[in-house]
Amino acid sequence: MKIIVDMMGGDNAPLAVLEGAAAAVKEYDVRLIGVGDEALVRKTAADNNISLDGIELVNCTEAIEMCDEPARAIRTKKDSSIVVGLNMLKEGKGDAFVSAGSTGALHVGASLIVRTLRGIKRPALATMVPAKNKAYLLLDCGANVECRPEMLAAFAVMGSCYVNKVEGRTSPSVALANNGAEESKGTPMLKEAHQLLKTIPGIRFVGNIEPRDVPNGDVDVVVCDGFTGNVILKLTEGVAKMLLGMLKGMFLKNLGGKLAYLLLKDSVSDLKHQMDSEEYGGAPFLGAKQPVIKAHGSSKAKGIKNAIRQAKICVENDLCGTMQAALDELNTTKE
């Protein structure tokens, strides 16, 4: 198995990408193809005593910046690490692609270069979100701001396949994000989507879920349009950061708080670990013909390593093939 890694993507590239890639080679027994400025990558590796064993380097002369317009960048920056990496994936030179670079460019590139599964026009961006009982898969979380009911149905099918194959959960539950639990709630589009989701074979649709209940982690997959998903994701991140900050302030406020921290530090450490998004790797573009994983732009070595692990699991379990079979069944049912 070969996984292609964008060495230039993210706020901490190339050092964090190198550290994560080297750790993945040791821990997961994978071969990597690092795409980027080869001279810079080699110098960074040498300066930080990072082994390049198991990492083949492919030189690129360009990089897509976060400020670049995504579609234009994909068309014009042909020798950028994202475009070169996605083309290598399409040509079968690797089995999956991992990048912490521009989300927009990756979405456009996954659609136009790697192409999409039958029945999918644009991939959905999905991410595992920490929650009280268990992490849940949220999709779409930003790639498709407006969605039709048929798109949400496809998201539900792909999300169910992902949680089953990658997270190892049998018969995952699927819920539709809405402003009320009743079938009568929501916009006309959401009402239609609800009725459609009830008819899909092969998924366990449990109905609508209100935003206040999403953080409980009672369901495995939460389906929504990209606008709603992005709001849920960023609000969750903000609240988590706020709560951890308040907790820290409480412990540091006085001697009693400091003593309480000494008694509870293991529990606090467990909580921080549970809420750490880097533990879950990256966000897959579900619907692309081959696995494309978007690591967080601020990913450190652990986040990159886990995104590579995530890509490896997708390949080993033939996630894209499984999703295509499920989508074909969905389209046959609709006909």
Label for each model-derived stretch:
Residues 50-94:
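Phosphate/nucleotide-donor binding subsite
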Residues 5-14, 143-153, 294-301:
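Short, glycine-rich nucleotide/cofactor-binding loops
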Residues 15-16, 31-33, 39-42, 145-207, ...:
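Glycine-rich phosphate/diphosphate-binding loop of Rossmann-like nucleotide-binding domains
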Residues 1-42:
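N-terminal phosphate-binding or glycine-rich loops at protein starts, especially the Walker A/P-loop
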Residues 111-124, 128-138, 218-222, 226-335:
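Glycine-rich phosphate/nucleotide-binding loop
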Residues 13-17, 79-92, 96-110, 117, ...:
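Short glycine/serine/threonine-rich phosphate/pyrophosphate-binding segments
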Residues 6, 34-36, 58, 99-101, ...:
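Short beta-strand segments
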